[in-house]
Regions:
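Structural signal for the C-terminal ends of transmembrane alpha-helices
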Residues: 60-69, 139-146, 198-208, 261-271, ...
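Alpha-helical transmembrane segments and terminal signal-anchor/GPI-anchor hydrophobic tails
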Residues: 210-278
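Hydrophobic alpha-helical segments with transmembrane-like composition
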Residues: 54-55, 63, 93-102, 109-203
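Functionally critical transmembrane alpha-helices in membrane proteins and complexes, commonly lining
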Residues: 5-64, 82-90
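Aromatic-anchored segments of alpha-helical transmembrane domains
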Residues: 16-23, 90-91, 157-171, 219-234, ...
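Membrane-interface transmembrane-helix boundary segments in multi-pass integral membrane proteins
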Residues: 242-254, 306-327
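Functional transmembrane helices that form membrane-embedded active or gating regions
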Residues: 3-15, 75, 80-83, 210-224, ...
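Transmembrane alpha-helical segments and their boundary/interface "anchor" motifs
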Residues: 44-53, 65-97, 106-123, 134, ...
Length: 343
């Protein structure tokens, strides 16, 4: 199977971006008079493409899985790679949450199952629900994504953009009830579908130079609009308007696919030396592990080292240190039999 090294680069960049997102949550405080709040907002918007990149990479890798193996093998591979770590780390966080947040311990299996089913254990684990849902949908989506005829893929993307990226986003920003058409459309209106299919499409399509230029300009414009609108509406409404840079919104979607295409366009033919290949593959392989454990380091820095979340140290230096420590730990765990299955 051909290896695309730009995918390794994307995985590494997206992992770093995730950590920057989670160390700049001071933006949620809406302390609009503090210059550090504006920096936090800029960081939040600048790195919002992190999880969408993972979604697009999954679509790019897996929507043509039938070329390599059957659906039964696909499910075995995917569920072992993601479902097992999801359950394991959900259990770990379920056990230690009372100690982190100083709550009484009251463990029982029914409570754990309910917490897993309702995503109340670890907020950042929302990613797993979408990715597992994608795996379940992949056998159907893979019948729509056809390299020889991309018409249905484009139709699916168009439906997603109209009902999710435009209409749903419009009502979300206005704090209004979502449009009823969104719930009536039976396929294509789920937020994640757009990213999964977009990743597959961009991987298998060579855009014209003018198309790339339009996409890059639109992506940059989206960043400026999201930063400006988030700051303006947050000040005006007196509460943080997170919805502006929602990844399911038009600007978040355009920005994310712009990042994907930019890296692909510049590194698609990249063939690094054997030593660099080894390093890229090793570091890229830590992405899931870093995702599930990096919050431990952030909590430690905040509660034990007393690094205030409004400080520049927390927003600019801590994420680099957390990523390096998390990556090193995951690489170590990869060497341990059985434990290497959970990261």
């Amino acid at each position: 199977m051909k290896r695309y090294y730009y995918m390794d680069v994307l995985a590494i960049l997206a992992t770093i971006a995730v950590v920057f997102l989670h160390t700049s949550e001071y933006a949620f405080s809406n302390h609009t008079s503090d210059p550090h709040w504006i920096i936090a907002v800029i960081l939040q918007v600048t790195f919002i493409w992190a999880v969408p990149i993972f979604f697009m990479m999954s679509g790019a890798h897996l929507l043509d899985y039938r070329e390599r193996y059957n659906t039964s093998v696909f499910f075995k591979k995917r569920m072992a790679k993601v479902f097992v770590p999801f359950i394991f780390w959900s259990l770990v966080w379920y056990i230690i949450n009372p100690f982190i947040f100083h709550k009484p311990t009251d463990y029982h299996i029914g409570q754990f199952v309910d917490a897993v089913m309702h995503d109340t254990i670890q907020p950042i684990f929302w990613f797993f629900y979408f990715i597992i849902g994608f795996y379940i949908s992949a056998p159907l989506l893979s019948k729509i994504t056809n390299k020889n005829d991309k018409t249905l893929s484009l139709y699916l993307l168009a439906v997603n953009m109209v009902f999710v990226n435009l209409l749903s986003y419009y009502y979300e920003i206005r704090s209004q009830t979502d449009n009823s058409f969104l719930h009536g459309v039976q396929i294509g209106a789920a937020g994640g579908v757009g990213f999964f299919v977009a990743g597959w499409y961009l991987k298998n399509t060579v855009l014209h130079k003018w198309q790339k230029n339009i996409l890059y300009v639109a992506a940059l414009a989206s960043v400026v609009i999201m930063i400006t609108l988030t700051i303006y509406l947050s000040i005006k409404r007196g509460k943080f308007v997170r919805e502006v840079y929602d990844i399911w919104g038009l600007f978040g979607f355009v920005f994310s696919i712009g990042v994907f295409e930019f890296v692909k366009n510049h590194l698609e033919t990249y063939r690094p030396s054997l030593k660099v290949q080894f390093v890229l593959q090793k570091v890229a392989s830590t992405s899931l592990g870093v995702y599930v454990i990096h919050e431990f380091f952030i909590y430690f820095a905040e509660r034990k080292l007393h690094i205030v979340d409004s400080s520049l140290k927390h927003m600019l230096i801590l994420p680099v240190i957390v990523w390096l420590l998390s990556t090193a730990l995951v690489l170590f765990i990869h060497k341990i039999p059985l434990l290497n299955k959970i990261v």
